[in-house]
Amino acid sequence: MVSVEDLHGLSAGQASVPDCKLFPQSPSAATRIAVLLAAALAGAAGGVALASAAGPQPLWAVLGAAAVAGGLLSTWSPCGYSSISLLRPDGRGLRAVAGWLPTFAMHGAGYGLGALMLGGLLGGIGLIAGFSGFGSTALLVLGLVGLAYGAHQLDFLRVPYPQRRAQVPHDARQRFPKWVIGGLYGLSLGLDYLTYVQTPLLYMMTLAAVFTGNIAHAIAIVALFNLGRFLPVAVNALPIPDYRVQAWLARHQENAALADGAILTALGAGFTVLALI
């Protein structure tokens, strides 16, 4: 197996190089079962704790943390790779990073606008449908969705995962300044359903936003998810070559899916227990 680091060091005069294959070893069935059981038990215990909590703040804290985690895990989607590799400073050093900051800021602004638009839509749908928060039925639906997609991510169950198989348009970078591209990419990714997102946590956060029946609360949930999507681009401010960032992401692809499955399972178990108590 040839790593990206190995290829980087090959001389320019070499006529050809072996294919680069960065396919991490999939976790064993025993590992996946252990993760599933541990996450379910931890989630159930969390559900019991939430049931005894005074006020909705702990539940909102769990949802907020899950939203940010979902956004971070979406970095392992094609658009996550693309935004990190394409929205890089031109050159190296502090001056290059300073010149790149408007691109970074516009990227964040695009995500913010996407959160306002998608969150406003989801909250409005929930308001029209008559939802008013996380009652037993809403929690049970969220719980079952989390358990199903947790098993899906851990490769125990096949669940439909409809997504738009598209990425942000790479050719746009040839037509606009980079700071404009940063904003356009941020808006495209911040609307969340215009491009492919690999984590089913997006579905849970979408349902949660609708169930609030509150536009401001729905925007907050989507904004936290988008914050998690936006933050990894900050790695471009560090003196780390792009090929190393991409190689690290590729090596941890299976670990990301494992973490995704664990979070979904824990949330599913917790919300199900909370709904039934």
Curated annotation (Swiss-Prot):
Broad class of the protein's primary localization: membrane
Compartment annotation: Cell membrane
Keywords, sorted A to Z: Cell membrane, Membrane, Transmembrane, Transmembrane helix
Domain of life: Bacteria
Secretion signal, residue range per the UniProt entry: none
Transmembrane segments: 33-53, 59-79, 111-131, 132-152, 179-199, 205-225, 257-277
GO cellular component, one term: plasma membrane
Pathway the protein contributes to: One-carbon metabolism; methylamine degradation
Membrane topology per record: Multi-pass membrane protein
Protein name per Swiss-Prot or TrEMBL: Methylamine utilization protein MauF
Organism: Paracoccus denitrificans
